[in-house]
Each structure stands twice: as C-alpha cells, then as structure tokens.
Swiss-Prot record:
It catalyses: 5-amino-1-(5-phospho-beta-D-ribosyl)imidazole-4-carboxamide + formate + ATP = 5-formamido-1-(5-phospho-D-ribosyl)imidazole-4-carboxamide + ADP + phosphate. This is 5-formaminoimidazole-4-carboxamide-1-(beta)-D-ribofuranosyl 5'-monophosphate synthetase. It comes from Methanococcus maripaludis (strain C6 / ATCC BAA-1332). GO terms for biological process: 'de novo' IMP biosynthetic process. The gene is purP. Catalyzes the ATP- and formate-dependent formylation of 5-aminoimidazole-4-carboxamide-1-beta-d-ribofuranosyl 5'-monophosphate (AICAR) to 5-formaminoimidazole-4-carboxamide-1-beta-d-ribofuranosyl 5'-monophosphate (FAICAR) in the absence of folates. Residues 116-348 form the ATP-grasp domain. Its cofactor is Mg(2+); Mn(2+). Disulfide bonds: none annotated. GO terms for molecular function: ATP binding; ligase activity, forming carbon-nitrogen bonds; magnesium ion binding.
Length: 361
C-alpha cells in the first residue's frame, strides 16, 4: 500500500487554488464531473477517442486526457500528467477495473478521494463478508462449496463485473452445468470458478442504498436508493410462465441500467442504522474507514427485514439515477444534490479547513 505520507507529500507540491477533479470516462463520471464543476473545480476526464462524445456533448470536462486503452491509466506518464494538473482522482468501479486493484494500492501515486485501502474489501468476498457480518448486518448464509448446496443459491464472482456471470441454482449438478456453459461462452475462466462465492438465495424486493460518510462531520448521510434493470432476468419475467418453461433459458443478471425508488418511511430507521453500523466497523477494520460514498445492496423480505448481499466501498453505478438530486439528498439542503456534487463539497470544505488529509489517500 502506498504510504499516506507519500500521497500527502505529493499533494503538498500542488497549487491548492488549481485543484482538478479527475475520473475515468465511464460508470458515474458524468455526475462526478458535473458536481465538481458546480462547486467551482476544474475537471478532467480520462478517455479513449472513441468514447469521448458524452463528455463533449454534456460539457462536463474542461480537459481531456486521451489514452489508447483504459488500462494505460496506470502508466507513469499518465500519472505525471495528472500530478501536473493538481489532480484528485475520484475512483469508481470502472477506474478500479481498468487500473487494477494492485496498481491502485501500490503504484498509482496520485491523490485519491476516499480510503484506497478499503477497495479490496469490496472486491474480495471473504473480506466483504467479514466487514458486513462484523457490522451486525443480516447477510445471506454462505456455502463452503458446490457440494454443500442444499437449496436455492446465488453464485457470484469477485470484482466489479456488473453481475456478469452470476447465476442461481439449486443442486451441485446444476452448478457444474451452468459453470460449463459460462466457460464455453467465455464469460467465466477457471480462475473465476475457483473464486466462486455461493450464498443463500434471498427472496425479496431489491434496494441499492447509497450513503455518504463525511469524515469532516463524522456523519452518515442517506443520498438515494435505486433498483437495477438486469438482462436477461427482467426480460424473462415479462414472458408468461408456460412460455418460460418452453424457452428453457437460464436467466443472467447483467446490469444494464438503474431506476430510482423510495423505500417505505418506516424502514428508514433500519436504513440509517445499517449505514451507521458499517461506517463504525470500517473505522475499526480498515482505518480510517469508509470515507465518502458507499452502497449497501439489499433485499427486503416479507418480514420487512433488509438483508445485505453486497456492498460498494466507493461511488456505485446506481447514483446515476439522481444526477439532479434524489428525494432524500434534497432534504439536507432543500436543493438538488447529486453524489458527485456531494463529493466535491467535501473536498472543497476539506481544502478550506486545511483538512484535506482527512479525505484523500
């Protein structure tokens, strides 16, 4: 892990009046960049030439850093270009996937918003389970391997893969059949199979809950809630049951979009309690904790119990559903507030208070 002192040494050489907020052109970059501009920051996007159109058309980026391929963002010349523009990187799922988690931890020497040490805790299922379970949150039962399957389960794989390759099954035979099909299609590798995470299939309504922990205020804020459009499952459920049986199609769970929702108000105490518990446990296990945005992906069962099946330890894709604010985020200020602008507000306040060390790593 890059020492915090080294990152702070880099930041001390910056022109503090000309800080640029930078992210990779993908995932949640539109509201990250727009939010930064609304708070008066210069912005830059890292992109390839065939993917720069949204950032030009929407006018969210002041500067463009072009790479031949997104994995080039870890190259030293790109890092130096970022340092020269006094950059603070805002990481999201695509940034981590393209840069590589090992590079983020050990070689990417550019100041980054949030706690870069916690990113591995969302990527590795055992660490994620340790954090979620240690927080006292209700999580699905975990199975040690396919031979332990004794009922409906969901099979997942590590990393930010947008649900690609996930599948449900009920028997060990079905597990290996589907593994074989996905390997044949090139969706899964043998290494993926070795890291398969098998958990209880929880029946319930899906809620992805987006929080922001402010280290400057020591407070967890509820920013918004969304649900996902997943292919092919959301298309299959529109097919009559008798026709589904004739089609014999195994559903997939690839995230293709998101839509905003509100949760019944009587569940909000449970929602806040979950966020508070996770933030508290994160301070203990991965100091300095869960800085900035995080997400708990949950299912609400018929007993109105929220079961957390996954977390994001950085800005989650579902925050795109409230680029102009959510029914919850607007309650804090009375004005529209995206997650991107909330991040920029925290950076701006940290600079004003000379407490930037509290929000970057």
């Amino acid at each position: 892990m890059i020492p915090k002192e080294e990152i702070m040494g880099i930041f001390e050489k910056y022109n503090k009046d000309e800080v640029t907020i930078v992210t990779v052109g993908s995932h949640t970059s539109l509201h990250i960049l727009k939010g930064a501009k609304l708070e008066g920051f210069s912005t830059a996007v890292i992109t390839t030439r065939d993917r720069d159109i949204p950032y030009k058309r929407f006018g969210v980026a002041d500067k463009f850093i072009y790479v031949d391929k997104f994995s080039d963002i870890s190259k030293e010349e790109i890092q130096q270009q970022l340092r020269d523009m006094n950059a603070i990187i805002v990481p999201h799922g695509s940034f981590i996937a393209y840069c590589g988690l090992d590079n983020v931890e050990d070689t990417f020497k550019v100041p980054m918003f949030g706690n870069r040490a916690i990113l591995r805790w969302e990527a590795e299922r055992d660490l994620e389970g340790q954090l979620l379970g240690g927080s006292g949150l209700r999580i699905p039962k975990k199975y040690g391997g396919p031979d332990d399957i004794d009922g409906p389960v969901m099979v997942k794989f590590p990393g930010a893969r947008g649900g690609r390759g996930y599948f449900p099954c009920s028997t060990v035979e079905e597990f290996w059949r589907k593994i074989g099909e996905f390997k044949a299609k090139g969706i899964l590798t043998e290494d993926d199979v070795k890291k398969a995470h098998i958990e209880e299939y929880v029946v319930g309504a899906n809620y992805c809950i987006h929080y922001f922990y402010s280290p400057l205020k020591d407070q967890v804020e509820l920013m918004g809630i969304d649900r996902r459009y997943e292919s092919s499952i959301d298309g299959l459920v529109r097919v009559p049951a008798k026709d589904q049986l004739e089609l014999s199609i195994d559903p997939s769970y690839v995230i293709t979009g998101n839509f905003p929702v509100v949760i019944r108000e009587s569940l909000l105490p449970q929602v806040f309690d979950m966020g508070d518990k996770l933030a508290t446990k994160a301070k203990e296990l991965v100091k300095p904790g869960m800085l900035g945005p995080f997400c708990l992906q949950s299912l609400c069962n018929e007993n109105l119990e929220l079961v957390v099946f996954e977390m994001s330890a950085r800005v989650d894709g579902g925050t795109n559903t409230f680029m102009n604010g959510s029914p919850y985020s607007c309650l804090y200020t009375g004005e529209p507030l995206s997650m991107g602008q909330r991040i920029a507000k925290e950076i701006k306040l940290a600079l004003e208070l000379k407490m930037i060390d509290k929000v970057i790593s």
